[in-house]
Amino acid sequence: MAVRLSIALLLSAIAMTSAGAADEPKSFACNFAGGAAHVYEKGQFVPEKATALSFGIAAIDNQAQTAELRTERGAGTLRVVQAVNATHFLEVVTEGSLHITTIFDKDDAKGAYPAVHSRHFGFFGQPIVTQYHGFCEAKE
């Protein structure tokens, strides 16, 4: 009896996980109006204003942990990491830069998904870090 109950609970959990994954958006349009940048110069990080940023995330496959980055300049490959209340998208750029986008659960009152985008890279040996905050909208 206990074995049947355990199996039933396990199957219920799997069914709920599969149903939840099916409801997740397969693509997003993300807009980041605000942000901050810090450039390392002469032994310290100097703040600079970051310009607005927009891009898309498409072909999200949580099972394979992959997605596509879509920008005006082309497409790139993303790695997907699922969290409890968010999804992280990691882009490792050819030059070794790391870009991370985190899209949190939908804010039903706003109708959009709060999001943060961070970039860690260097330019001619100078570290530059940026962080943006904004929203993503689910696309079909």
Each language-model region and where it sits:
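Positively charged n-region of N-terminal signal peptides that target proteins for export
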Residues: 1-5
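Bacterial N-terminal signal peptides
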Residues: 6-15
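Sec/Tat signal peptide C-region and signal peptidase I cleavage site
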Residues: 17-22
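Short, solvent-exposed loop/hinge segments that bridge or flank secondary-structure elements
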Residues: 25-67, 98-102
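Predominantly extracellular/secreted and cell-surface proteins with exposed
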Residues: 54-100
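Hydrophobic/aromatic beta-strand elements that line small-molecule binding cavities or substrate pockets
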Residues: 55-58, 100-108, 133-138
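Low-complexity, intrinsically disordered Gly/Pro/Thr-rich segments
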Residues: 111-124
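Edge beta-strand at a domain terminus
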Residues: 121-140
